[in-house]
């Protein structure tokens, strides 16, 4: 018996990186999962791998109609919804404000925020009625960039900070029917895409030169995470039996970013 036996989840951005790791872990814990993503080939591959434990919905989280359709498909296939996981996001390749041309700013801002903030809110809005009925939960993927500077550029860090407010306000608005929590991963070996056109060097996060070494050296645990290492937190927060009184909380899964200290001391194995 898994922690999520017979539960139903909807995961956005579920075709790669942390998203697909969550989907696989939820299935292993006994859940049925609806997976929303933009890439038809990746959705098909995940469906072939996991069979009738999942359904897939191709769509764009920035569009209300697509979020509504994903929830409707979940209810049609599985009869209810217990957990909504907002996970879709894009990166900004550490682009500073003064490196964004003024004539490009509005487009870049709207593109990133439409996915990284608006997409979470639209998904939450679409899922609310079903989650009220099941007295379920919402879980949002944040980042250590939701709390600290330097983990991205101005747009990414601002958007992730905004999600802290989203979690707190939704937890307030939706109580006592729906629990709302988040997971804030640190540096992770994930192919999260950078915003197209924002930076001529933009590549997936795990292909940025020096990313893994630099990020590992910055935290006390001295390594970056694989996507699977974060998934236990999503299982815990979705579990009524184990987190039934947990709401408005964010679990940090970042290798100890907060306790880096102000000096240059190196953490060594003993």
Enumerate the predicted regions with their spans.
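Short, small/polar-rich loop/turn modules that mediate ligand/substrate recognition or access, typified
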Residues: 175-179, 245-247
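Alpha-helical segment proximal to the catalytic Tyr-Lys
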Residues: 129, 171-176
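Catalytic Tyr-X3-Lys loop
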Residues: 101-121, 139, 156, 163-164
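Conserved glycine-rich cofactor-binding loop
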Residues: 8, 15-17
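Conserved mid-core segment of classical short-chain dehydrogenase/reductases
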Residues: 90-110, 152-155, 264-269
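C-terminal substrate-recognition "lid" of short-chain dehydrogenase/reductases
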Residues: 121, 130, 223-252, 258
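The beta1-alpha1 cofactor-binding region of Rossmann-like NAD(H)/NADP(H)-dependent oxidoreductases
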Residues: 40, 59-70, 228-229
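Residue(s) in the substrate-gating loop at a strand-loop-helix junction
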Residues: 143
């Amino acid at each position: 018996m898994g922690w999520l036996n017979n539960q139903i989840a909807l995961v956005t951005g579920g075709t790669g990186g942390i998203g697909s790791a969550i989907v696989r872990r939820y299935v292993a814990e006994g859940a049925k999962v609806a997976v929303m993503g933009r890439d038809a080939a990746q959705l098909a591959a995940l469906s072939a791998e996991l069979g009738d434990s999942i359904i897939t919905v191709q769509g764009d989280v920035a569009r209300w109609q697509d979020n509504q359709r994903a929830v409707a498909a979940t209810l049609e296939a599985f009869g209810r919804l217990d957990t909504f996981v907002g996970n879709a996001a894009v990166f900004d390749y550490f682009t500073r404000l003064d490196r964004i041309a003024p004539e490009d700013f509005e487009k870049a801002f709207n593109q990133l925020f439409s996915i990284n903030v608006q997409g979470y809110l639209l998904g939450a809005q679409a899922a609310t009625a079903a989650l009220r009925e099941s007295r379920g939960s919402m879980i949002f993927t944040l980042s250590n960039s939701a709390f600290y500077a330097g983990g991205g550029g101005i747009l990414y860090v601002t958007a992730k900070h905004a999600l802290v407010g989203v979690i707190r306000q939704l937890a307030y608005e939706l109580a006592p029917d729906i629990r709302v929590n988040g997971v804030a991963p640190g540096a992770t070996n994930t192919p999260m895409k950078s915003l197209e056109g924002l930076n001529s060097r933009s590549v997936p996060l795990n292909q940025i030169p020096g990313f893994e070494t630099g990020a590992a050296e910055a935290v006390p645990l001295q390594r970056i995470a694989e996507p699977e290492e974060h998934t236990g937190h999503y299982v815990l927060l979705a579990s009524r039996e184990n987190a039934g009184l947990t709401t408005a909380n964010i679990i940090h899964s970042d290798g100890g970013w907060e306790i880096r200290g102000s000096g240059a001391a190196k953490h060594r194995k003993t």
